[in-house]
Structure formats: C-alpha cells, structure tokens
C-alpha cells in the first residue's frame, strides 16, 4: 500500500507541475478590464461601461504589439509614459498630441478625425492593433476597423469617474506592449503619491476654501457632479464644493443665474476655457460678477499646451492625477509656484 500511495502522490505532483502558469490581474480601482497571462498568452477582457459586468471584448495575443494606431491623444499619454511612442504608426490629428517628439511627428501618419478616421489610411499602415475609444453603444467605427481584418482594443478610461481608476488603464497598455512590470510600477507609484496627498486634502478642509468649475457657453454652464472625475478630485483636494454630495457621474447644466446663485462667493475658479480675464469677460460680462474673477483666482489647465491645440492635461494628467491634485491643493492655499497643469488667468 505504501508503494502505491507513494506513486499516486508522485503522479499528483507531476500533474500539478504540468498545469499552465496563470496570472490573472483585475483592476484594483476599476471594473473596466481584466488581464490574464497564461504561459506565453495574454488575454485582455474589456467590460462595458454601460452594462455592468457585460464583456465588451476579449483580445487574445501571444506577442507584444509592434505597430499601433491610436484614435485619442489620451492613449499617447499612457504610451509615452511607458516609452513606447516608437510603436505608434498612426494617430488621429497628431497636431493635437502633446507627447510626440519631432521625429515622431515626421514618422506618424495622420489618420484623420477621431469621430471619422480614414479607413484607407489605416489599412495602408498595416497596423497589428487599433486602439479605440467608443463614445456610445452602437458606435460604427469599431465594426469598420474590424472589417479591414485588423484587431481592435477598446480603451474606456474616459468613462471612469475616479482619478485612480483612469490612471490604472496604464496596466492595459503595459500588457499590450509586454511591459506589464513597468506599468504596474508606475501605477503603484501614482497610488502612493495620490494617497499621501489625499490625506493632506483631509487636513485642508478646515481651511474652508470653496471651488467652482467651467464657464458659461451659449447660455449653459456645465459643472461636475460630486460623483464625476473632477468632483472626486475636488473632494480629495480638500475643497468645499456646492455639488460634492450629488452622487451623479454626469455634468450638471446650469443657467447663468443658477451659477451666480451657487458660486458667486467661491474662492477658486478652475477649468475655464478662456486664456485671460479679458477673454472671459468678452465671452459673458456676467463672469466678472464672481468673487474669484474679481480676486484674480481663475485658472485653466493650459500651462502645458501648444498653439496647435495639443494639451498635456488630456494626456499625462490621466496617468498622473496626483499632479492635478497637487495643483489644486496649491491654489487652494494661494500658492501659484510650481504649478504643473494649471495656469492663472491675468
């Protein structure tokens, strides 16, 4: 019996040893994706941002991708952080991309507008992957790309409502390029820095500084609800915000009169689209009625912007929300030195 028992145990060990090595990684801050690595095969599962738990796509591959087409400048924020811009062969409106070297700009092909990419140009580039964002269910662009016989990958980071959830999508790009360890390291560093600053934000609440966002455009003023990306940033920065307790993940449309009622006495004004106080007044003279305007405490996110319209805020800030958080905490304390993305209007 002892010999039979020994042989059975030995066979059991062999069977266990022969099982394929599997490493499954789900998002820590997001339910938007899952990455499974089994031996030399990687599977990225993307979940629908509109139907919770519903699989939107699965991408299975055995080699890192070498020729990438991107439809959003935000994708370049992740790719640049990983040092992989040399893998990009096409992008929508490259003049609107901040994180490209002159060499990259000469080499990369413009594939047209992100809402209607040029399929002929994409086909001629012979990419092995097209990274897409989808703006709605039933978006026709993914089917058009797949009809060319080219694999696609949905990048839905823009639907995430918390800063760390958006930043975590760098792990998807790490899997695509075969540099998962580097992507995990970047994200861990971001989480650590953001967590430390969020604790500082808790302390700043006692200062009682209030914040407002956006501006009036054609009669409507959109402000972030408390459950949005920016609403969460305001909370983590330690700012008092009128709609911080509104759990919606959508923007709230206000009339100018409502905005004045809600924010006339706000201390800090961020995220307006004007480049100067004079321009802000020209858009609507009532902008001058706000305390923040009168105190010259108005900021946009254009410190790292180019005349072409490229703006690093839409790229690296997605990867590094701790930099945005630090900017917000600085201006709440009246400190404008060393701001990374924010620029005071004068």
What residue spans do the PLM features occupy?
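Extracytoplasmic ligand-binding site segments that recognize negatively charged/polar headgroups
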Residues: 94-99, 138-141, 156-171, 208-232
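Flexible, glycine-rich surface segments
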Residues: 199-284
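Second-shell loop/turn segments in exported
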Residues: 64-67, 78, 107-113, 129-132, ...
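Bacterial Sec-exported substrate-binding components of ABC uptake systems
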Residues: 18-76, 182-212, 278-281, 294, ...
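Soluble non-cytosolic domains of exported or imported proteins
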Residues: 69, 113-117, 135-139, 160-167, ...
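Bacterial Sec-dependent N-terminal signal peptides
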Residues: 1-26
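Structured C-terminal subdomain patch of bacterial secreted/periplasmic proteins
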Residues: 66-67, 160-185, 271-346
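A short, structured surface patch at a secondary-structure boundary
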Residues: 46-53, 61-124, 129-135
